Regions:
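Active-site neighborhoods and metal-handling regions in enzymes and metal-associated proteins
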Residues: 1-257
Length: 257
């Protein structure tokens, strides 16, 4: 059984959520054509450490960077590299922080310069599907209610939901129970209780739902090489309405798209 967090633990995780949200905003400020993904990683790691925290992803199961940076058809877990961002790309930036013994986790997919109408729709729908999932993250519901909300919204626009990857519980460990799929049926899955802390993270493909693992053993790519978007927030399950621990406000108030 999943142990709900105490209010003291949630307060520490709230600090983490703000830090990871601010980190993504710092990264977003420099996303532009001509910038390498290594530079995005450098900015994030410096900001995290300057604020007294540790990048959670660095060294996690051998992962070599502070950020997962996934461009275009890379769904998640891409490595920062000397790849130069191009006009029309999209770049998913997934950030984790360890602060005062607890983890924070959030992801945002940024457009690089001007993107085409289908790509813009993919970004908008994926982000809204996240909010639909969050609306279902209330005490008494089940993880299937979250997945159903994400899936039905995304698929209504002709997009597809990745099945092999899912959200997760979070706390002292980056990945805790329960798993939080982005598809499912109402009333199925783990029961949500007040005080549970979970990450909801839709990964939505423009084309087919199928994905494959790249040769580096980390990056997950779409099978048809069409674009994929990824948005993630950490929430506390509450009675009536989930509480956000991370937020996109710092990004959307400070970054021009």
């Amino acid at each position: 059984m999943v142990r709900p967090k105490t209010e003291e633990e949630i307060a520490l995780m709230r600090e983490n959520g703000i830090l990871v949200s601010r980190t993504l905003a710092e990264v977003g400020k420099i996303v532009a054509p001509g910038v390498t993904t290594l530079e995005l990683n450098r900015v994030a790691e410096t900001f995290i450490r300057d604020n007294g925290a540790i990048p959670s992803f660095l060294g996690y199961d051998g992962f070599p960077a502070a950020l997962c940076i996934s461009v275009n058809d890379v769904v998640v877990h891409g490595f920062p590299s000397d790849y130069v961002l191009q006009e029309g790309d999209i770049v998913s930036v997934d950030c984790g922080t360890l602060y005062k013994g607890y983890n924070g986790d959030s992801a945002y997919t940024f457009p690089v310069g001007e993107v085409d109408a289908e790509t813009r729709k993919l970004l908008d729908v994926t982000k809204e599907s996240l909010y639909r999932g969050i609306a279902a993250a209330v005490a008494g519901n089940r993880t299937g209610d979250i997945g159903h909300a994400v899936q039905t919204y995304a698929e209504s626009f002709g997009f597809s939901v990745v099945r092999e990857l899912e959200g997760h519980g979070i706390g002292k460990k980056m990945h805790e129970s329960p798993g939080v799929p982005n598809y499912g049926r109402r009333g199925q899955g783990a029961r949500l209780t007040d005080g549970m802390t979970i990450c909801i993270e839709p990964m939505i493909n423009a084309g087919l739902k199928n994905v494959y693992l790249a040769k580096d053993g980390w990056a997950v790519r779409t099978s048809d090489h069409r674009k994929s978007a990824h948005f993630e927030l950490t929430v506390v399950v509450r009675k009536g309405q989930a509480e956000l621990l991370s937020t996109f406000d710092f990004i959307e108030d400070n970054v021009k798209f």
